[in-house]
Amino acid sequence: MNKASEAEAVLPELLRFADGTAVAAPAAWPRRRKEIADLIVDIEYGGLPPTPAETTLETLHLSSVRGLEGVRFLSGRVQTGPDRPFAFLLTLLLPPGDGPFPVVLTGDACWRYVTDAVAADVLGRGFILAQFNRTEIAPDVYSDARSSGIYRVYPEGAYGALSAWAWGYHRCLDALVGQPFVDASRIAVTGHSRGGKTVLLAGATDERIALTAANNSGAGGAGCFRRQGPQSETLGDLMRNLAYWFGPKLRAYVGREAELPFDQ
């Protein structure tokens, strides 16, 4: 890396407010945290969809699971409302016993549900495995990006698909935390690639999430926009091919990544 590149790769100072003053004590961190979050949510993601007044979980089906003694399968409907209602499916595999159990939640069921081996491992550790299809919340198709899902319910705003999918995780949290079999203090979220980008946003904007486990989230996730290794995903790549994941303001920083007031 040459000297010019080194200068451009300097990351924004985490413990300094936008006005230049230092975060001098732990008590000041929540204010700085909110400052960073507000910038990122606005510039990178185009905001977040509105939070509904209420969210419920309706049980559609509950049964035992053949070959897994004591394990139960619950298929439920997450329903928001009362104004501008929206619903999507959430499935749970519950370990033996009454709980309350910790939860591993993933929205990557759009690709495929987890394998039997992974499910058995999660259940064997005494965790609930919760899964939903994030493309029920917003489509993952460039040419049809705002035609269905919550875009029909909340057409206002400039939020991209990542914000919509993160909203889905938040509504699952709403539905789960009041259940007697759920340990609301131990809920983890996980996702891969674009799902990893999604859970990083979901975890950063909902402190009920105890653990965020993102896998291969790339640029716009755990990877930097400023610092790039060989064949890294870049902001330019994202804007050329997948701009609908993000808010419209981010495009202005292609080739000007060093001017972003944050990096991730």
Which ranges hold each PLM region?
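Alpha/beta-hydrolase fold nucleophile elbow
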Residues: 181-193
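N-terminal targeting or regulatory segments adjacent to alpha/beta-hydrolase or S9 domains
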Residues: 1-88
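Generic beta-strand/beta-sheet core signal
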Residues: 132, 190-192, 212-217
